[in-house]
Each structure stands twice: as C-alpha cells, then as structure tokens.
Amino acid sequence: KSAVEPENIRITTVKTSPAFVKFEIYAQAPCRITLEIGHGLQDDEVYFITESKDSDECGNVALLIKVENARLWSAENPYLYRYRITAGADVSTGTFGIRELSWDAEKGFCINGVRTILKGACIHHDNGLLGACCYPDAEERKVRLLKETGYNAIRSAHNPCSKALLDACDRLGMLVLDEYTDMWY
C-alpha cells in the first residue's frame, strides 16, 4: 500500500494575492514528505518550489506554500499547476488550480473577484451508448462539448462524477456541483 494515497491529499487556496496554498497530506505512517510544485501539465518541466517536512507520529503533514506571481484558475483561463509528493519510496502526482471563490449581495458569485454567472447543465454519469463505465476520452469529450456550447458549470445528476470527468473539468474550465448520491436520509 502506498504511503500517500491521492485521496489523502487536500489542497486549499488560502489567498490569491499573494498566493498561498495549503497542502494537507495524510501518510499511512510517519515519514519525510517532499512536495514539489511545477507549472503546466507537462511533466518534463522543472519544479520551481520544493518543500520537505517530517510527518507527525500519525503520518500527517501540513505545508503552507507561497506561489510567487501565481496564475489564477478561472472558467475562461483554467491554469493548472502540477505537484509531486514523495513519501519514502512512494510518489503521488496531480494538478491543482489557484482561485478564490466569494459570494456577496451586490456582486453575487465571484471567481478571483470577477462576477461569474453560472450557465449550467445537469449531467448523468453515463456516456450514452458507451454505458455507465468511465472512459477518460468520453468524459473529456462530454465536458468539451458543453464548454463549446457556452456552459461553464455542471451538476452531477444523482451520482458523483468520475475522477476523469473532474480532471477534465479542471483542465477545460468547468465548475462542478458534485452530487453525493440520489438517496434520502
């Protein structure tokens, strides 16, 4: 079992100007954790931030990272950073965007201080004739077609979105309301 599973990494934008990003990493055991951050989606680029810290006795680490001259994520410009987390011999990678969400009575919903009108659609987890299985290319196509039609938001109807669909939304600039389940408690 990997020391750091992707679902055990929480990334939060603390503020955008200057940009501070908090990484909360939950390892399976105490170890030294190294975090590297790079620009864009190409893994051959150099990582420009490297931080290391020893985890506590439960394997938990929190790192607050300042990102100089940060490029912000928005629906119109979905800029993503890459991260690589090393814990012992295990490596976990992924992407994240830096953005600030706010709501107020005058402007409504804002991304990075810019008023944003949601133009959304409810989508089901299936891919038509392909069925309910997740195919990354089909998920990307679904998001791309919605984006090209003028949508900037989706709500998953009755089931959670697949990881592939959420990743496509991050890359293409689609906001998501990810429904937990179609069930009353």
Regions found by a protein language model. Name each.
Residues 183-185:
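Short gly/pro/ser/thr-enriched loop/turn and capping motifs at secondary-structure boundaries
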Residues 1-176:
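Secreted/periplasmic carbohydrate-active enzymes, especially glycoside hydrolases
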